[in-house]
């Protein structure tokens, strides 16, 4: 990947890179761009992904347990079989994201996440728990009926 300076800080750009099975657990990846990259079965557990971009990325089977995903761009990302348990997705953008077979969302905070109505309904069908960091109830954050 390449890197660039934006606003005085370095941002790594991994556009179109194959990052299957990589381990990013606990890393500070704030603002990193993973757009259009293949990042299947990667480990982002407890990573700081605030404002990162996964636009059109293949994240199938990746683990985001207890990750800070505030303001993350997941537009058109493939989250099939991803593990989001305990993640904080506050204000993330996920219009067009593929959530087929996304089942591991317990204790996830979805507050103010921009998503389609059908995505919200699918997530409400399996939502449970309370986010350990924010204390927000998963179903309430999804505005489930």
Question: Where are each of the predicted segments found?
Answer:
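Tandem repeat scaffolds
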Residues: 1-145
């Amino acid at each position: 990947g390449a890197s660039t300076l934006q606003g005085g800080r370095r941002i790594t750009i991994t556009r179109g890179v194959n990052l299957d099975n990589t381990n990013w657990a606990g890393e500070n990846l704030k603002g990193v761009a993973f757009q259009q990259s293949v990042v299947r079965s990667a480990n982002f557990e407890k990573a700081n992904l605030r404002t990162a971009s996964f636009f059109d990325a293949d994240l199938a089977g990746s683990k985001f347990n207890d990750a800070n995903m505030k303001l993350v761009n997941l537009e058109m990302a493939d989250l099939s079989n991803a593990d989001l348990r305990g993640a904080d997705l506050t204000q993330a953008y996920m219009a067009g994201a593929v959530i087929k077979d996304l089942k591991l969302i317990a204790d996830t905070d979805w507050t103010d996440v921009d998503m389609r109505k059908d995505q919200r309904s699918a997530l409400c069908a399996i939502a449970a728990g309370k986010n350990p960091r924010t204390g927000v109830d998963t179903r309430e954050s999804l505005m489930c009926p």
